[in-house]
């Protein structure tokens, strides 16, 4: 069937080619030829192939011992002559030439690659015959077989300018797709067969198909490769044919197609192709990363153009804007930048690094991410920024790539002044070779030229000035403002000073980074592939590290700039993330500015304005720097000691910078500001935590942020596009909780730009900088409260935010956000429908959890009706209370189990929001309580301890304060955190539970006041548990969510940012008021009372009263 079908298709295809050929330049003539050839081939391949061809193949396999593919190809080449095929197989390519004779003219076209063509034709025949044989033997289907031929023919056609010749060749090879005929059967030049993308897409299913295209493209040489490239619309057009081939291979998933059948043959052929195309192909294959390294390294003068091209290419792959702008910067040597072009060139390495590292790292963080991530992490961990200056060169030498190493080596000497080298190093991370060369040349050309971009140069200067000394800061400001070169000198001193300390650290981690490229190189195993491998390896390694350490990658640059070890770490890492955003968002930002923001806390804001400076480069940047540096100088004067207090200084700086930034409020400035401000805000909070702690938490933050930043940078870019509107930036950031700090910065920036509100709230934000993010989430509507709220949020952010906040949109959202909205919906149903009754899963969960605790408790929840009525009736609650009290004691002991009571249903509901309480019930039951309960208690407590405690700073934010405060936070806008915290056991339940009363029964326990607690017991179990639990249902989902995500605590905290549930987030702003009132009634009261339990009774009343109607009722959720 397949054979006949295939043949039919082929014939149909032949007919089509005639039509399409008629349409195409060389119509029927070629079509007729191709048709005849194809007819013969089709008969041989299809009609005969099923029996004859396959028998022949078997015979060949037996006689020659070759594999089936080789035999098929040989038969194909020999037109079914078994003896001839045996000779070919045994003797080698003897008949390949004769077979090519069909495509002799093609040879003429590609005599250069005649051998390659032979191999290619042979291969394509192999593959095409494979396709045919597969069609016949494997039943792949005629279409695929034809596609193979078409591809082969198409390739041949591409190579063979003469369609007739190509058609002949195609006929010789097999029924030509009409490709040989020019347009070929498919009038559109290969309905995809012609285009590499179409090739791999349509024929990707056929291993051979894409391979044919790729290999043939490489083999075909300039003619075919160029045609394919042009058709493909790949960068390959601009590059050599082999480069285009490399692109095709890289873009076309050639690796997959190289995998099995074709690999051996293709490998040798690849070697052949590699020899001729190694340098050029490497340009494209690496995904442009290799292009930068290999090409740029090889031709230093050419590297400038190559840089533009390679960067542009990488732009195509990765973040176009960042790379493009970087190209402009790099090209600033040749292109814009004028006064600052040299400075930009010296800075451009930085901006390139940051842009490439951040934007490029984010988008295509192959090398950059690898290098910068490890390097930056090392540097971040090695607090002193100066280390990075020298270290980057060393680290990035090994880290960026073996090839890059040379550039790196060059760069350290290149650092004519530490600033230049510093910039070089910064630029090193990703485009190190090119940047190193460019920066070297440029720096050599304009060591002092760095001065021209006061913003950019000043930024490095600032970073370095910071490194230099607090004492220098006044002069540093002057220097920065006056001459970056002067600051460069100072910087060179200061930078070199820290370098000795930290170089070793960076070097230590360099090998891993270098290992990654090495392994990546190893991946393909072929010369061409090696270049490609570097790209892939870098991409793969870079992708993960760059995501986790993506902020870090810029951070290395940042850390270079930042002299203070703790400060540099915490600052650089968050800033790095923001830098990523900025660089990605603002390619024109020169991310040098962004780097500046990274290097300096206020500098981050500063850099935001320098980013804006790109437009109003000198003025805004100078102003930003001037006011900025004054604070920076003061804060920097005590770099080590003020570190923690530096946040305060930073907030001032931030205030200054946003103010200054406001004027240059360019789109880049905005995006830069959000990220930088957020970094600034974030870092202070981190610095508050502790330099060392922050560095690891920051690493986590940067990891989560980095991943978030990816989206953030995209959104940030939107924000930038949005222009200076802080609200829009915030919305982009806030939607991207991932922009946690970024969002915080956004909100902060907004308020900063707004004016005083930032100054007061920014101080809070600096301490609460992370908190700013949740604030940001809700901050676009109101920043002041969110910023204030951020006080608690920041701790949540470090722990919870990275996983939950960002993940919800980035990683978590797939499961989390949908779950939240759905879960919120379920919660709405739960609240509205009294889930206990509607969803037995929750009652089951509760009884299960309660069952382990107390059967009577289970009764309370089970008699959801009674309990509900109990809500209404204190009498019902009284009995409920009695069980509740046992539950209380048990819930105290088992309040984790109690949490399952809340969570178990919720987790199922949460995780199986659709199924939740029915199907999810059992799993919620077992899965929820077990999985969720321990996570709830452990993670949530952990969250409360780590996150709630810092955020709440209430002793053992464990359950009591943590939960109460969690609600406070929730009210304040850390919705998810609040939910997760307070919601942990249940709104009132959580506080009570934290009080140790009992998760839900804690309310009853809390007062044990029969009347109220009874109500609480019943209400809590039902109204509370269900209403609250509904509310908590929100919280448990964070926990369930965390459990699901595996980062329960953080996730719950992460929820705090308000992402956890959009509903929560929604509720947060809207709910922030009504729900805040309710929650604040019980939660704040709990928090105020300081004892979740005792306060809870009174708060519970309002909660029972207000919450029942408002909170317990759907209205809460509705809100």
Curated annotation (Swiss-Prot):
Key words of the record: Chromosome, Coiled coil, Cytoplasm, Methylation, Nucleus, Phosphoprotein
What are its GO cellular component terms?
chromosome; cytoplasm; nucleus; P-body
Q: State where the protein is found.
A: Nucleus; Chromosome; Cytoplasm
GO MF annotation, one: cadherin binding
The record ties this protein, via InterPro entries, to: TC-DDR_regulator, UBA, UBA-like_sf, UBAP2/Lig
GO BP of this protein: regulation of gene expression
Stretches with biased composition (Polar residues): 651-662, 679-694, 943-957
| Gene3D superfamilies per record | DNA helicase RuvA subunit, C-terminal domain
Residue intervals of the UBA domain: 48-92
Quaternary state and interactors: May interact with ANXA2.
Which PANTHER family does its entry note? Answer: UBIQUITIN ASSOCIATED PROTEIN 2-LIKE/LINGERER, UBIQUITIN-ASSOCIATED PROTEIN 2
Disease note: Reduced expression of UBAP2 correlates with hepatocellular carcinoma tumor progression.
* Protein known as: Ubiquitin-associated protein 2
What species does this protein belong to?
Answer: Homo sapiens
Organismal lineage = Eukaryota, Metazoa, Chordata, Craniata, Vertebrata
User: Corresponding gene?
Assistant: UBAP2
């Amino acid at each position: 069937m397949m054979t006949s079908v295939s043949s039919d298709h082929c014939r149909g295809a032949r007919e089509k080619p005639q039509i399409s050929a008629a349409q195409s330049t060389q119509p029927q003539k070629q079509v007729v030829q191709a048709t005849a050839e194809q007819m013969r081939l089709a008969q041989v391949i299809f009609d005969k192939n099923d029996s004859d061809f396959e028998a022949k193949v078997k015979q060949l396999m037996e006689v020659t011992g070759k594999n089936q593919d080789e035999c098929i190809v040989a038969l194909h080449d020999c037109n079914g002559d078994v003896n001839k095929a045996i000779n070919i197989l045994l003797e080698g390519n003897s008949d390949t030439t004769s077979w090519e004779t069909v495509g002799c003219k093609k040879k003429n076209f590609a005599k250069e690659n005649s051998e390659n063509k032979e191999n290619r034709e042979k291969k394509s025949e192999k593959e095409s015959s494979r396709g045919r044989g597969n069609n016949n033997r494997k039943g792949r289907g005629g279409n695929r077989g034809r596609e193979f031929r078409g591809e082969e023919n198409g390739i041949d056609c591409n190579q063979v300018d003469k369609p007739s010749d190509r058609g002949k060749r195609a006929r010789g090879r097999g029924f030509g797709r009409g490709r040989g005929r020019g347009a070929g059967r498919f009038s559109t030049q290969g309905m995809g067969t012609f285009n590499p993308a179409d090739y791999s897409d349509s024929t990707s299913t056929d291993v051979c198909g894409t391979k044919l295209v790729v290999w043939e493209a490489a083999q075909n040489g300039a003619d075919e490769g160029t045609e394919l490239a042009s058709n493909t619309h790949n960068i390959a057009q601009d590059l050599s044919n082999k480069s285009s081939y490399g692109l095709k291979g890289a873009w076309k998933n050639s690796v997959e197609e190289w995998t099995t059948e074709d690999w051996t043959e293709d490998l040798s052929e690849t070697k052949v192709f590699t020899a001729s195309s190694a340098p050029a192909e490497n340009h494209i294959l690496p995904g442009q990363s290799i292009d930068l390294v290999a090409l740029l390294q090889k031709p230093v003068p050419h590297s400038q153009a190559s840089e533009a091209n390679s960067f542009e290419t990488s732009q195509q792959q990765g973040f176009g804007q960042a790379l493009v702008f970087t190209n402009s910067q790099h090209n600033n040597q040749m292109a814009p930048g004028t006064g600052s072009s040299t400075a930009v060139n010296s800075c451009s390495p930085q901006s390139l690094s940051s842009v490439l590292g951040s934007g490029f790292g984010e988008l295509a963080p192959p090398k950059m991410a690898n290098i910068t991530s490890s390097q930056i992490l090392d540097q971040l961990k090695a607090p002193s920024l100066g280390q990075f200056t020298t270290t980057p060169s060393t680290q990035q030498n090994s880290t960026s790539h073996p090839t890059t190493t040379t550039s790196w080596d060059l760069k350290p000497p290149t650092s004519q002044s530490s600033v230049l080298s510093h910039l070089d190093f910064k630029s090193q991370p990703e485009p190190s070779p090119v940047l190193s060369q460019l920066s070297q040349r440029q720096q050599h050309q304009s060591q002092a030229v760095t001065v021209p971009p006061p913003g950019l140069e000043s930024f490095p200067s600032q970073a370095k000035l910071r490194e230099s000394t607090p004492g220098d800061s006044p002069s540093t400001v002057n220097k920065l403002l006056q001459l970056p070169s002067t600051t460069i000198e100072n910087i060179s001193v200061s930078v070199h000073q820290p370098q000795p300390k930290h170089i070793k650290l960076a070097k230590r981690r360099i090998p891993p980074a270098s290992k990654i490229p090495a392994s990546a190189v190893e991946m393909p195993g072929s010369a061409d592939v090696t270049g490609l491998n570097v790209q892939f390896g870098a991409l793969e390694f870079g992708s993960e590290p760059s995501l986790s350490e993506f902020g870090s990658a810029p951070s290395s640059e940042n850390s270079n700039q930042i002299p203070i070890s703790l400060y540099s770490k915490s600052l650089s890492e968050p800033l790095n993330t923001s830098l990523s955003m900025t660089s990605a968002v603002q390619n024109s930002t020169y991310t040098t500015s962004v780097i500046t923001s990274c290097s300096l806390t206020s500098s981050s804001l500063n850099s935001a304005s320098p980013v804006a400076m790109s437009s109003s480069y000198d003025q805004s940047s100078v102003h930003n720097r001037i006011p900025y540096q004054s604070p920076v100088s003061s804060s920097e004067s005590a770099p080590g000691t003020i570190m923690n207090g530096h946040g305060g200084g930073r907030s001032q700086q931030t205030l200054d910078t946003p103010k200054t930034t406001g004027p240059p409020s360019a789109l880049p400035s905005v995006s830069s500001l959000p990220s930088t401000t957020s970094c600034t805000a974030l870092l202070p909070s981190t610095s508050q935590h502790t330099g060392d702690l922050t560095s690891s938490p920051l690493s986590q933050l940067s990891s989560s942020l980095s991943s978030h930043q990816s989206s953030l940078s995209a959104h940030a870019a939107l924000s930038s596009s949005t222009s200076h509107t802080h609200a829009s930036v915030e919305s982009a950031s806030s939607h991207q909780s991932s922009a946690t700090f970024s969002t915080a910065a956004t909100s902060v920036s907004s308020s900063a730009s707004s004016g005083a509100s930032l100054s007061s709230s920014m101080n809070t934000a600096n301490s609460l900088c992370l908190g700013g993010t949740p604030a940001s989430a809700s901050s676009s509507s109101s920043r002041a409260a969110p910023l204030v709220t951020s006080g608690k949020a920041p701790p949540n952010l470090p722990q919870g935010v990275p996983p939950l906040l960002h993940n919800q949109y980035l990683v978590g959202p797939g499961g989390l956000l949908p779950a939240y909205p759905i879960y919120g919906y379920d919660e709405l149903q739960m609240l509205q429908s009294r889930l206990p009754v509607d969803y037995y899963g929750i009652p089951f969960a509760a009884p299960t959890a309660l069952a382990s605790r107390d059967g009577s408790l289970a009764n309370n929840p089970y008699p959801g009706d009674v309990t509900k009525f109990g809500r209404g009736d204190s009498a019902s609650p009284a009995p409920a209370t009695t069980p509740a009290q046992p539950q209380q004691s048990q819930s105290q002991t088992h309040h984790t189990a109690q949490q399952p009571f809340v969570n178990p249903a919720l987790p199922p509901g949460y995780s199986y929001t659709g199924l939740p309480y029915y199907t999810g019930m059992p799993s919620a039951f077992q899965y929820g309580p077990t999985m969720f309960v321990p996570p709830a208690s452990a993670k949530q407590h952990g969250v409360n301890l780590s996150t709630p405690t810092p955020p709440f700073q209430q002793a053992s934010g464990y359950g009591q304060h943590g939960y109460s405060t969690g609600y406070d936070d929730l009210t304040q806008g850390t919705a998810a955190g609040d939910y997760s915290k307070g919601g942990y056991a249940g709104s009132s339940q959580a506080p009570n539970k934290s009080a140790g009363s009992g998760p839900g029964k804690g309310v009853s326990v809390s007062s044990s006041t029969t009347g109220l607690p009874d109500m609480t017991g019943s209400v809590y179990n039902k109204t509370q548990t269900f209403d609250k639990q509904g509310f908590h249902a929100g919280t448990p989902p964070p926990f369930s969510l965390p459990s699901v995500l595996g980062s329960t605590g953080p996730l719950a905290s992460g929820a705090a940012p308000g992402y956890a549930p959009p509903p929560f987030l929604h509720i947060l702003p809207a709910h922030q008021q009504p729900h805040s009132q309710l929650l604040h009634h019980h939660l704040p009261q709990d928090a105020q009372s300081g004892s979740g339990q005792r306060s809870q009774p009174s708060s519970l009343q309002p909660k029972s009263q207000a919450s029942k109607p408002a909170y317990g009722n759907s209205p809460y959720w509705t809100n």
